[in-house]
Amino acid sequence: MNRRNFIHTSGALIGAGMLTNPLDAFSFTQKKTWTVGEIMDAFIAQVPNAPFAQTVDTIKVGSRDTVVTGVVTTMFTTMQIIHKAIELKANLIIPHEPTFFSGQDDTDYLQNDPVFRAKYDLMEKHGITLWRNHDYVHRMKDDGVRVGVVGDLGWEEYYTPGSRILNI
């Protein structure tokens, strides 16, 4: 193997290792297992003035006590995302937007809705916990969604951390 292939392969392996447990970046010692609640608490601890008394960032399916086998983050919890989580053996889905049609994810009126039932029942059947993360990620010191969009668009040179305005 030449040096270029070695560096490329090593970088891919290291990157894959970092993706395996993103919470390793938050500590010097690795923890063997994490519960949904511990992941939530670790995230919320980074947000100024959190936790919030009123927020949509609650568990919609599952339990804080679930031991996490993998995490899928997404903008929207579609059936495709739920199936991908099952395929990856990930039992925590963290969406940004509502899963069940309303901003508050109120589901009382949806109990007989076939789309609601399909999503909810599939997650429940596979032991998936769904924790919505909308308010907390927007209220981080640097809005997490903004930082993600800036990175995806390659606009880092136009962005000043903490600023809401990009100078393009």
Region roles according to the model:
Residues 2-168:
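Hydrophobic structural segments
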